[in-house]
């Protein structure tokens, strides 16, 4: 018994364990969603209504939306804390290093959209899905990266985090501008006021994390009610919590330490389980001949790494930015392939683009997203494994 416990402790303490659990959860979801015996149970779980009421405020969501909007806000809170630490004390501390993932993210959004339009520009309906391959699923991309464990340079992981956050922010802006028609200006005003309070707390030197979380809950609720993706609130709160150490304690680092195991072994696996169960009913290989899925596949698998690599090369050539310390151009290119994992964010944009037009288009889009994302995950992992191994051997 002691030996089994020791093996479990060793597994959960390894850097790769979170990625393994996430992949298992995603595989289980795919099997359950596409098996007649379990598909009903799977979808019933996701559609379970959950109600939260505080005074006159009432939020009614199903389990899927609570996982995606609430639990994933905690994940983005952790990402915000980690990126802030690296911007101030770590691999993104210099201006040229900090601007590098910003430029990479721009390339990773612009080029995939252009590749998609190269296939679908002539079709006015399909053209509406131009933003589908511009998105990156940060949770799955980091999950695949985690499979490589401690072999991955910290700076490379932070680069992917920063790039994916900017990519996600870009996707949120795109959704708000092009796919959302009922934004609540009142809720956005409340959100702006909550951000102002968070900034005031930070500038006043308030170090009690609980106060930031409380105001953050108000911010999350306001963003949710506004029609904008609520996970944005997590990133903002993460950037507002003080990092500076006093008496040997840093509020941001302490919270980061507490959140890590919960995010790795509960929140991300739940997210994977809730979102990876893509039903393949109605999806046929004949659909692969359609320009819609071909454009998405090409955008994710070719456009993403091409855009990121091209913009990074230009930034380095023009001396606008510099590589994160301890990384190589080949590793950056491999990370660019991983960013082709569009998955949940791409599916979300596809439902917004085609949901009111034709359900068949959503099925075709899902086919392109699934194949493009799987190709990006497998090829990106294999190439990156070789690149980090080569670097370690050279040292």
UniProtKB/Swiss-Prot annotation:
Keywords: Antiport, Cell inner membrane, Cell membrane, Ion transport, Membrane, Sodium, Sodium transport, Transmembrane, Transmembrane helix, Transport
NCBIfam families: NhaA (TIGR00773), PRK09560.1 (NF007111), PRK09561.1 (NF007112)
Function of the molecule: Na(+)/H(+) antiporter that extrudes sodium in exchange for external protons.
Bridged cysteine pairs (disulfide): none
Lineage start: Bacteria, Pseudomonadati, Pseudomonadota, Gammaproteobacteria, Enterobacterales
Primary residence: membrane
Keyword Transit peptide included in the entry's annotation: no
InterPro entries listed in its UniProt record: Na/H_antiporter_dom_sf, NhaA
Entry superkingdom: Bacteria
Protein name: Na(+)/H(+) antiporter NhaA 1
Cellular-component GO terms for this entry: plasma membrane
Any single GO BP term: regulation of pH
């Amino acid at each position: 018994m002691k030996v089994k416990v020791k093996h479990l402790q060793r597994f959960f303490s390894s850097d790769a364990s979170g990625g393994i659990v996430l992949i298992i959860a995603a595989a289980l979801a795919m099997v359950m969603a596409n098996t007649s015996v379990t598909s009903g149970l799977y979808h019933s779980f996701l559609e379970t209504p959950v109600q939260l009421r505080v005074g006159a405020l009432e939020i009614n969501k199903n389990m899927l939306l609570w996982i995606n909007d609430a639990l994933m806000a905690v994940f983005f809170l952790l990402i915000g804390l980690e990126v802030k630490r690296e911007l101030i004390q770590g691999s993104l501390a210099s201006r040229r290093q900090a601007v590098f993932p910003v430029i990479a993210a721009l390339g990773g959004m612009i080029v995939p959209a252009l590749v998609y339009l190269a296939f679908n520009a002539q079709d006015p309906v399909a053209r509406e899905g131009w933003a589908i391959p511009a998105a990156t699923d940060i949770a799955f991309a980091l999950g695949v990266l985690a499979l490589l464990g401690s072999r991955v340079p910290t700076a490379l992981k932070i680069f992917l985090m920063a790039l994916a956050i900017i990519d996600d922010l870009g996707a949120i802006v795109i959704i708000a501008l092009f796919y959302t028609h009922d934004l609540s200006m009142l809720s956005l005003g409340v959100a702006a006021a909550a951000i102002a309070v968070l900034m005031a707390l930070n500038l006043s030197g308030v170090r009690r994390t609980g106060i930031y979380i409380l105001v953050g809950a108000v911010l999350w609720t306001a963003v949710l009610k506004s029609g904008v993706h609520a996970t944005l609130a997590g990133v903002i709160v993460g950037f507002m919590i003080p990092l500076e150490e006093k008496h040997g304690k840093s509020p941001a680092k302490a919270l980061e330490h507490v959140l890590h195991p919960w995010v790795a072994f509960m929140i991300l696996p739940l997210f994977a389980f809730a979102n990876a169960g893509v039903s393949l009913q109605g999806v046929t290989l004949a659909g692969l001949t359609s320009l819609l899925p071909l454009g998405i596949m090409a955008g994710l698998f070719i456009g993403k790494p091409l855009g990121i690599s091209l913009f990074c090369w230009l930034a380095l050539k023009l001396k606008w930015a510099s590589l994160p310390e301890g990384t190589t151009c080949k590793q950056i290119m491999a990370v660019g392939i991983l960013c082709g994992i569009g998955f949940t964010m791409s599916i979300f944009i596809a439902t917004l683009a085609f949901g009111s037009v034709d359900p068949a288009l959503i099925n075709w889009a899902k086919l392109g997203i699934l194949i493009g994302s799987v190709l990006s995950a497998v090829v990106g992992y294999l190439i990156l494994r070789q690149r980090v191994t080569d670097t370690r051997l050279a040292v």
